[in-house]
């Protein structure tokens, strides 16, 4: 997919440097995002947060039990709002 992550490197605190399939890259600050929702409880400690991997084009933790949609990560990294109509036109 257009927004799949192809590379992820831990930066600091709750920040990860991401590179996307479409060539865009940047740092996603996920501290506020993971502070809500019971699903993220396990990765609210820095030690657990650092244990991410890239699977199926997105970030996952705990062997895939926790993930964040690549579109969400793209928006948080680039600041660009995704409009799916434009994606269909680009990818045809």
Report the location of each language-model feature.
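Motif-centric detector for short Cys/His coordination patterns
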Residues: 1-92
